[in-house]
């Protein structure tokens, strides 16, 4: 038995196929989803989506930039602001973006700049973690 996983952004479909299981980062922590999972709707945090295509496969990773997920009837629909498969992320560009985000956080002045810099840093870290394959 499998799950039908769809990952959608406002501009494109990132993923639309069957998978064996996923691990999703929600605002209240990670959840594992297998076939016949109880129905749930949840907020998705900035973080890594782990996808296993078959029981013997390793994990594929994807960087998610926050949104919502609906799980039920062996279908998982994830609607996010943005998402990138690890295989689509340029490692050098991601590392450069992370370094810029860290520098921007160090020089942030005031509450608003600090909040924006922290958010940019979380996004940049997530992209780098997706490439490096977060340990399961």
Curated annotation (Swiss-Prot):
It is a peripheral membrane protein. CDD domains: F1-ATPase_delta. PANTHER family: ATP SYNTHASE DELTA/EPSILON CHAIN, ATP SYNTHASE EPSILON CHAIN, CHLOROPLASTIC. Produces ATP from ADP in the presence of a proton gradient across the membrane. Keywords: ATP synthesis, CF(1), Chloroplast, Hydrogen ion transport, Ion transport, Membrane, Plastid, Thylakoid, Transport. It comes from the Eukaryota. It is found in: Plastid, Chloroplast thylakoid membrane. InterPro entries: ATP_synth_F1_dsu/esu, ATP_synth_F1_dsu/esu_N, ATP_synth_F1_esu_C, ATPsynth_dsu/esu_N. It holds the Pfam family ATP-synt_DE_N. One of its GO terms (molecular function) is proton-transporting ATP synthase activity, rotational mechanism. Gene3D superfamilies: 6.10.140.480, F0F1 ATP synthase delta/epsilon subunit, N-terminal. HAMAP family: ATP_synth_epsil_bac (MF_00530). F-type ATPases have 2 components, CF(1) - the catalytic core - and CF(0) - the membrane proton channel. CF(1) has five subunits: alpha(3), beta(3), gamma(1), delta(1), epsilon(1). CF(0) has three main subunits: a, b and c. One of its GO terms (cellular component) is chloroplast thylakoid membrane. Belongs to the ATPase epsilon chain family. This is ATP synthase epsilon chain, chloroplastic.
